[in-house]
Regions:
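Active-site neighborhoods and metal-handling regions in enzymes and metal-associated proteins
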Residues: 1-364
Length: 364
């Protein structure tokens, strides 16, 4: 990613400004995506102590070579071979913050109690301090998400022509996940959803061994990851020629999704964004069949802020990347969902995925 050192310095300064605003002397960061955002460290274990003068990453022997390479000058790196909690305690005592913020949504009560026992610092719970900063993406982050979306779409385009009679949902998922990896996806941000026929009425169906059947719909929800950043895309296709009901439901979802991705703006609330699609689907008689929110933030995590939901009153910030994914789910029949990734730029929404939602009818 471009100029990681400069970006990390800017992010550190933003966290310090939040600490000063909230009356905190330092922050203990335990959530790994937050640590990666601040330092570039991609390991599976570590804690980060953030203060006005700098940051200290404490991790274990497994990352003795990796951590310094990834972090560079963004933070001091401490490799602790035996007792990371004790080494963290010594680092806090050396910094001597009067008040130490902790990520209350990450640390367990037991971990927080152990940490605070014997510390002179007053331990203060915080909520989503770093996550709120992460909602606003810089150019390099947007580029990574766009790249992830592009390779995801290339993978799907390669796999759809291979879908054949006798395939199981899990066969399609396996070929898609292989195609994603072969095109450069670092990992699958979530288990690929391939749901056919009546199973597509389950928004988060677990991919099964059910065989695909001509005349049904096939819902595919999948993602890719580039430089740690996620794309999240859903397409629904017909297995053979679509019938009138399938076309009607599909078109309702397609129109609602297009209106939403074109009408969403930074500065509106998550509730207002959700209402664009929800009102259209409700007006067509399917409001009760659209039971989930319109979308969510996207970045280092596949589900992050901001929320696009009927109960979300927070304002969508300039620079956020969100999914737009309305759906209609009819038990016993199936479901349709269409999902694209949208960047809320200052001058309006910009698609990061291709937005191609013409109904595809596979020759099964």
């Amino acid at each position: 990613m471009a100029d990681p050192t400069g970006a990390r310095a800017t992010r550190h300064a933003a966290v310090v400004a939040c600490l000063q605003r909230d009356g905190l002397s330092a922050l203990l960061v335990s959530h790994l995506p937050n640590i990666r955002w601040l330092t570039g460290f991609t390991g599976s274990a570590g804690v980060l102590l953030v203060g006005p003068a700098g940051m200290t990453l404490i991790t274990d022997f497994r990352y003795a070579s990796q951590a310094p390479q990834e972090v560079g000058p963004a933070a001091d790196v401490v490799i602790e071979r035996t007792n990371v909690p004790e080494r963290l305690r010594r680092a806090i005592e050396a910094m001597a913050p009067e008040t130490l913020g902790i990520e209350a949504h990450v640390l367990t009560v037991r971990e927080a109690e152990r940490l605070s026992a014997g510390l002179r610092s007053r331990v203060v719970p915080t909520s989503d301090l770093v996550e709120r900063l992460r909602q606003v993406k810089d150019e390099s982050e947007v580029t990574a998400i766009r790249s992830a979306a592009a390779l995801a779409q290339e993978a799907l385009a390669a796999v759809l022509p291979t879908v054949a009679a006798g395939d199981r949902e899990i066969d399609v998922a396996a070929r898609l996940e292989s195609a994603l990896r072969l095109r450069g996806s670092e990992w699958h941000p979530f288990p690929t959803i391939v749901a056919s026929g009546p199973r597509a009425a389950m928004p988060h169906a677990r991919t099964s061994s059910r065989e695909l059947r001509r005349g049904e719909l096939l819902l595919i929800d999948f993602g890719a990851q580039v430089d740690g950043y996620c794309a999240d895309i859903t397409r629904t296709v017909a297995l053979g020629p679509a019938d009138d009901r399938q076309r009607t439901v599909y078109q309702i979802v397609r129109e609602a999704q297009r209106s939403s991705r074109e009408g969403i703006r930074a500065g509106m609330t998550g509730r207002e964004a959700d209402a664009i699609a929800r009102d259209q689907i409700t007006a067509r008689g399917y409001g009760e069949a659209f039971g989930h929110s319109l979308g969510h933030g996207l970045g280092l995590e596949v589900h992050e802020g901001p929320r696009l939901a009927a109960t979300a009153e927070a304002v969508l910030p300039v620079g956020a990347v969100v999914t737009v994914e309305p759906g209609i789910y009819l038990p016993g029949w199936g479901g349709v969902r269409l999902e694209d990734d949208v960047w809320l730029a200052a001058d309006g929404p910009a698609l990061l995925s291709d937005g191609r939602t013409d109904l595809i009818e596979l020759d099964l």
